[in-house]
Amino acid sequence: MNIHEQKITPECLEKAANQVEDKREEYKDVLLQLKKMLGGTTPHSETAEILTRAYEQMKEYALFVQSIETFLRKSANNLKIK
């Protein structure tokens, strides 16, 4: 059975949400490492500014990934209720 023939089930959505959660946790570790690097840079240096912009973009992406995880879990719960 290929992916296009697979039915969307609560279990399938939960599995996807768990995979997203695992990646989000890994990503959180990368964010923490970047934040530590920011602490070691000279304030107002070009490197600090670039790292700060990257960090802010990464935080936005992390929120986006979290919203995907939430959507998947909510969708799974809605399917269970039906």
Curated annotation (Swiss-Prot):
Source superkingdom: Bacteria
Name of the protein this chain belongs to: Uncharacterized protein YwdA
